[in-house]
A protein has these predicted regions:
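Conserved SAM-binding loop
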Residues: 63, 87, 103-106, 136
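A short glycine-rich, Lys/Arg-flanked "PGG" loop and its adjoining helix->strand segment in the class I
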Residues: 118-133
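Conserved alpha-helix/loop element of class I SAM-dependent methyltransferases that forms part
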Residues: 18-38, 48-52
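A short acidic, Gly/Pro-enriched loop at the edge of an enzyme's catalytic core
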Residues: 93-105
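A short SAM/SAH-binding and catalytic strip from SAM-dependent methyltransferases
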Residues: 104-116
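Class I SAM-dependent methyltransferase SAM/SAH-binding core
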Residues: 40-42, 46-94
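N-terminal, positively charged/glycine-rich alpha-helical extensions of SAM-dependent methyltransferases
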Residues: 1-11, 23-28
Length: 157
């Protein structure tokens, strides 16, 4: 019961805080605006990328994340944008889309959390249109001690 309360009420806010740090936000702001056309975001989480999309370049956005608790926060963030968003409660190992469906796929600081990253990457390749872009940003251990502290706290997640 305590684990369920933690997962539903505390963990989403910890993830949001840790993933919203300045260094990570700067990286998001260089990667996400490149997305265009029909966009799939892998691990949309709490919607921290939503503010970085160029609404003039994005026709539709599908956000994939297995956590419904994170979807609720993403929906709140969506209100501050002009994006059309569909949230799908699935992991990236089974993307519910036809082959060659997306112009851009955005995956920021998520691949390290996917149980089977090779299958997820294979699925991303399958649904990405020929000539489409996979906009990927991952991290190793950050040089900033304050970021490292949060990375270590979230490692079990």
């Amino acid at each position: 019961m305590i684990a369920a309360l933690y997962e539903k009420h505390l963990l989403p806010h910890l993830i949001d805080f840790a993933c919203g740090m300045k260094a990570i936000t700067r990286q998001r702001s260089t990667v996400v605006p490149r997305a265009h056309g029909r966009v799939l975001e892998i691990g949309i989480g709490t919607g921290l990328n939503l503010a970085h999309y160029d609404a003039e370049k994005v026709d539709t956005l599908c956000g994939l994340d297995p956590s419904l608790a994170l979807h609720a926060i993403a929906r709140d963030r969506l209100a501050a944008t002009r994006l059309k968003l569909e949230l799908v409660p699935l992991s990236a190992e089974r993307i519910p889309a036809d082959d060659s469906s997306y112009d851009s796929i955005v995956c920021t600081f998520t691949l390290c959390t996917i149980p089977d990253p090779l299958t997820a990457l294979s699925e991303m390749r399958r649904v990405l249109k020929p000539g489409g872009e996979l906009l990927l940003s991952e991290h190793g251990l950050a040089p900033e001690p304050s970021v490292q502290k949060w990375q270590h706290r979230l490692t079990p997640v």
